[in-house]
Every structure is written in C-alpha cells, then in structure tokens.
Amino acid sequence: MTKDEDFKLLKIQTFSLRVNIHCEGCNKKVKKLLQRIEGVCHVKIEAEHQKVTVSGSVDSATLINKLVKAGKHAELWSPNPNQNQPQKPKTNDFIKNVNQKGQKQGSAKSGIEACKPKNGPKGAAFVAEEDGDGSEEEDGDVQFPKPANQQQQQNVVNAKKNSGGAAMNNGNNGVNAASKKVNQKQSNHNQNTQQVMAAMRMRTAGKMSTGVEANEIGALMGLAGFNGATNAVNHPPNGIQQQLQAPPLNNVNGVTNHNLTNSNGGMMMNMNGYNNHHPMNMQSRQMMHQPQQMMYQRSSFVPASSNGYYYNYTPSPYSYYPYYPYASDQYQQQSSHSHATNMSSEEDAGNNNSCNIM
C-alpha cells in the first residue's frame, strides 16, 4: 500500500486568477498566501492587469477560497468579461447596413431630381422666351449687343410677365394661345426697343470725342475772322444738352461767351489776359494756355498817364503800390512859398533887431 502511495502521479495544472491588487503590500501579501498553500509550485503576479498565475496540483476552487478568507476578492481570469455569454446573431447590424445603403441611394436620386428643371411657370416662361428668340432669328431682325446686367434684368421682367400670363391661361382654356402670342410679341417689342436704345448710346459715346475736334476747328475759324463757329454737342445718355461756343483766338478783350444750359455766370478775367478755359480745352490743349492761379484773379493796376513816369514802378502780380521817394511838383511849390515867406519874416525881424547872419 505504501509503495503505491509514494509513486502516485502528481497532476500539475496552471490557473490564472483575477485578484484585487492595489499596492506593493497587497502584492506581497497575495504571493505569500499562495505559496503557503500545499501543492502550489509557482506563483506569478502581474499587478498592472491584476492577474495572478498559479501552477501546481491544486484546484482553483481551493485557491479562491483561501484568498477570499484572507480578504482578497478572486475569480478565474477571462480576458473578456462577457465571454461566457452566448453570442447573439448579428441580424441587427445587417439590417442597419441595408437601411443606410437605401438612404444613400434615395439621397442621390433626390439630388438628381433637384437638378432637373421643374414644370413650373418660370420654366415655361424661359422656354417660351427661347422660342421667341428663335422666331426673331428666323424673321431676320437686326439684334444689337446688350450689356450683361441689362440682359439679366430684362430676362427677370419677361419671366415675371410670362408667369403672370401662364397663371391666367390656366383659368381660361379658350384664350391660352392668343394670350401667349400677345405676351411674346410684347416681350419681343420691348427687347427690340431696348436693344436699339443701347446701340444709340454706344454710337453717341463713340461720337463724344469729336467735340474736341469741332472746338479746335472753331478756334481756327476765329483766327480767320469768323468769330468762332458754334458747335453744339448733345449728350443723350445723361439727358442734358449743352451748346458750347468755341472761343475765338483773335478776341482783344480775352472774354469768351459760354452759352450753357446750366446757366454759368460771366467770368472775370485775370490781369494777364488769359481767359478761364472750358474743361475740354484744359484736357486737350494743356501746353497752349497758362494754368489758373488764385493770386492772378484780380484786376490789373493801370498807372495814370498825366503824372508821367513813376520811379520804381512794379507791375502786378505784386499787391503793394509803388513808393515815390521824390516830392511832387505841388509839394515843391508849397515848400518854396513857405520858405520865401519865412525868409521875409526873418528879414523884418533882423531890421528891427539889428543884423542877421546869412
């Protein structure tokens, strides 16, 4: 009997336990406690993961009971705590994926439908406008280029008009064709009139530069003695008509008559004889005339012809008047007369008093 007991095979097993370890003291306490148990061969503790590996011929139940009696909660180690629960079939995830794919396809279809033109009054208006443009091209009418902003505004106005006509046509079944034709003719007529006005504006803008040449020709005619040719320059874009008379170059007084509709007043002449030029002359002929200065805008000083030549006469633009160091003739006559009277009085006094030293 004893021989059989001595040679009994020992079954060595390895268990992994989860034990609450918070500090170094807990680590040492658990290790000592497990090593004292009979049949434990090796103990390994991982404090970070609270994992204890025990190898020996001992059941896991005895190890857990010993640790619980010592005040340490212990259980078998499992990497996933919910591993023991039966796994449910993943039907919910499959349903969610199918729903998401259906939503994506629906959003793509809605985006494509949003890009398509709707069958509304505005769409019909634009289609009608395109048809009207085609009819104009077939008729062979001359079309002038229009600015981008004006074209956009006209398109909006025509769209509003056509939308109103379409709304009325829905109620009246018998007047649909006639009202559409009338609206198209009115819109075409408005477009033609606006195109003609734009072309006229472009032509008048191109002819604005010819006013300078006409002004120069009028000045040359003034040299020949025709007193300048009147040149009328019309400005239809601004709605203002101005008539400008070219200044003759042979004018002696240097005063030019500007016939303006905005009622400019008469202009004072400066002392040098240069007139206040029109802005067109200031732009085109800058080197032919002297620029205006404020200090020259006063009347010139004209000396009297009866007094003869004055000493130190200074012409304008200086504001002070000449200084005369010599006395005038009248002052000299008065002084000589007074001196003669004084000498006569002195002689009378000398005769009375005795001699006078001359």
Curated annotation (Swiss-Prot):
Q: Which SUPFAM superfamilies match?
A: HMA, heavy metal-associated domain
Q: Which residues bind a metal cation?
A: C23, C26
Any idea which UniProt keywords this protein has? Lipoprotein, Metal-binding, Methylation, Prenylation
Q: Where is the composition biased (Low complexity)?
A: 148-181
Which residue stretches belong to region Disordered? 100-194, 332-358
Q: Which PROSITE patterns match?
A: HMA_2
Chain intervals with Acidic residues compositional bias:
128-141
| S-farnesyl cysteine: lipidated positions | C355
Q: Does the keyword Lipoprotein apply?
A: yes
Pfam families annotated for this entry? HMA (PF00403)
Every copy of the HMA domain together lies at 12-75
Keyword Ubl conjugation assigned: no
Which cysteines pair up through disulfides? They are none
Q: What positions belong to the pro-peptide in this record?
A: 356-358
Q: Which InterPro entries does the record match to this protein?
A: HMA_dom, HMA_dom_sf
In-chain residues carrying the UniProt-annotated modification Cysteine methyl ester: C355
The biased composition feature labelled Polar residues covers 184-194, 339-358
The protein's GO terms of the molecular function aspect are: metal ion binding
Give the similarity note.
Answer: Belongs to the HIPP family.
What is this protein for, i.e. what is its function?
Answer: Heavy-metal-binding protein.
> What protein does this entry describe?
Heavy metal-associated isoprenylated plant protein 37
